[in-house]
């Protein structure tokens, strides 16, 4: 994983040189330590704010070069907006805004982590630091030449001045590991498909062993013995063999029931024989965003030594249209024994998940399962790119996911499920079809998956709109977002981890 910015904490009284960042509210007020640090430069801030109509709105910035009265060569004021409305994840965004204003220079960066109400808490200062790292991430390793004006990599040392350095470091340590997990997920989603095919993906997931994660890789013969006919049917059209990877972190009590996360990992999706249009097909390298999230999450949980037992499982395939490819009209038998008529070979992700969900439910018997998948285009029609679709057979799990989404800014929206939708998958020749009618596509996909979880509490997150190609934000300028890592880490930490 690239590490392009170094973030640390220093005492509040540290003298600022290079670039100085400070925060104000929507009344252009500063905290006492900030006022002291600015000294007579506060007058320059007032003049510049009036000239540029800077109002301190959340995320807005005021940039002043060589401010009189400061040793800093540059002063950047970041608006925090109305303090009464600020939420925990807003500090992450403030860190992202900060990183976006550092620029390509090599000057030292000092940040006074203070609002008008006083110094930020250790957790808030840590969130600012995490936001800096998340915004700084960039995927450009395959560019050998840079165009004129193209952004240069951010290579800076950022010192965040806080009231209690030790407490800030302690608060940042687990957040830093979560950011590592987010960046790992982004890296996987951004990689080209000729580099990240199923075997290579499995190899990278296996590197989690260094953190104490148990990793088992099921190859094609092993999956055949397990009768994973749904997954193998998708994979059979590719020269790249499929894999299923089972990751196990045992941070909880010995023998305690684990929680489980399952990810769809279609490393490239042409649609198969039901081939996709050529426009934007290159984006289908990201059809493994769910699997990327699960690997990033397992990294985060293991690195911060989460006190919980966790199973992470990913099904890895390519969906290709060669002479051995699955056909519309084929009937496959899933690991559960249920038979599936293939109506559309481009409805392949649910086939991969069907076998992996069943495997995890029966072998590991988790407290709950959450699966993540870039499953349907229909979810973008319904929710756009701001929310992931949430489907579940368990109200408590849904409520907790929703609350974790609100806390992290990785939001979910629950959509309906019900037996009325099942008839849309009735098949004349098999137990079910793999695709329903045109309408309610995200719902029927979830109804399909529910048939493979038995009585296990389960939630399905359709992340087709949030995992890749979503609009750039204050904390992500990358095509791959790493969506879901922070959401699920927060779910585990708030509700299931031993205290």
UniProtKB/Swiss-Prot annotation:
The active site is at 276, 350. Mn(2+) 1 binds at residues 269, 346, 348. It is found in: Cytoplasm. It catalyses: Release of an N-terminal amino acid, Xaa-|-Yaa-, in which Xaa is preferably Leu, but may be other amino acids including Pro although not Arg or Lys, and Yaa may be Pro. Amino acid amides and methyl esters are also readily hydrolyzed, but rates on arylamides are exceedingly low; Release of an N-terminal amino acid, preferentially leucine, but not glutamic or aspartic acids. GO terms for biological process: proteolysis. One of its GO terms (cellular component) is cytoplasm. Belongs to the peptidase M17 family. This is Probable cytosol aminopeptidase. HAMAP family: Cytosol_peptidase_M17. PANTHER family: CYTOSOL AMINOPEPTIDASE, LEUCINE AMINOPEPTIDASE-RELATED. One of its GO terms (molecular function) is metalloaminopeptidase activity. Mn(2+) 2 binds at residues 264, 269, 287, 348. The gene is pepA.
């Amino acid at each position: 994983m690239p590490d392009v910015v170094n973030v640390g904490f220093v005492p509040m009284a540290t003298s600022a040189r290079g670039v100085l960042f400070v925060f104000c509210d929507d009344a252009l007020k500063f905290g006492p330590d900030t006022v002291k640090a600015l000294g007579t430069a506060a007058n320059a801030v007032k003049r510049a704010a009036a000239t540029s109509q800077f109002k301190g709105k959340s995320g807005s910035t005021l940039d002043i070069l060589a401010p009189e009265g400061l040793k800093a060569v540059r002063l950047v004021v970041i608006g925090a907006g109305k303090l009464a409305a600020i939420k925990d994840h807003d500090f992450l965004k403030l860190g992202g805004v900060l990183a976006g204003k550092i620029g390509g220079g090599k000057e030292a960066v000092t940040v006074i982590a203070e609002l008008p109400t006083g110094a930020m808490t250790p957790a808030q200062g840590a969130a600012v630091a995490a936001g800096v790292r998340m915004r700084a991430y960039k995927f450009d390793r395959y560019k050998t030449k840079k165009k004129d004006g193209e952004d240069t990599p951010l290579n800076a040392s950022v010192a965040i001045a806080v009231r209690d350095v030790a407490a800030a470091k302690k608060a940042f340590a687990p957040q830093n590991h979560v950011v590592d997990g987010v960046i790992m997920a982004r890296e996987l989603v951004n990689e080209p498909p000729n580099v990240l095919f199923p075997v290579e993906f499995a190899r990278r997931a296996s590197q989690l062993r260094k953190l104490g994660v148990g990793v088992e890789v099921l190859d094609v013969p092993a999956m055949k013995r397990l009768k994973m006919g749904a997954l193998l049917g998708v994979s059979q059209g590719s020269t790249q063999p499929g894999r299923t990877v089972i990751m196990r972190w045992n941070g909880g009590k010995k023998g305690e029931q684990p929680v489980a996360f399952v990810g769809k990992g279609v490393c490239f999706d042409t649609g198969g024989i039901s081939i996709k249009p050529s426009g934007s097909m290159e984006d289908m390298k990201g059809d493994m965003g769910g699997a990327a999230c699960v690997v990033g999450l397992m990294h985060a949980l293991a690195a911060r030594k989460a006190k919980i037992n966790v199973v992470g499982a990913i099904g890895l395939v390519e969906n290709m249209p060669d002479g051995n490819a699955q056909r519309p009209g084929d009937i496959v038998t899933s690991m559960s024994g249920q038979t599936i008529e293939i109506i559309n070979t481009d409805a392949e992700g649910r086939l991969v998940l069907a076998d992996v969900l069943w495997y995890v439910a029966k072998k590991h018997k988790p407290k709950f399962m959450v699966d993540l998948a870039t499953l349907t285009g229909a979810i973008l029609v319904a929710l756009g790119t701001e929310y992931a679709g949430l489907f579940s057979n368990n109200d408590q799990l849904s409520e907790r996911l929703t609350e974790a989404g609100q806390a992290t800014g990785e939001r979910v929206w629950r959509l309906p499920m019900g037996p009325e939708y099942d008839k849309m998958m009735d098949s004349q020749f098999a137990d079910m079809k793999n695709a329903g009618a045109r309408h309610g596509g995200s719902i029927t996909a979830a109804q399909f998956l529910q048939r493979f979880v038995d009585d296990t509490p389960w939630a399905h997150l359709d992340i087709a709109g949030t995992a890749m190609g979503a609009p750039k934000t204050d904390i992500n300028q990358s095509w791959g977002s790493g969506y879901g890592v922070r959401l699920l880490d927060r779910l585990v930490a708030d509700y299931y981890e031993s205290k």
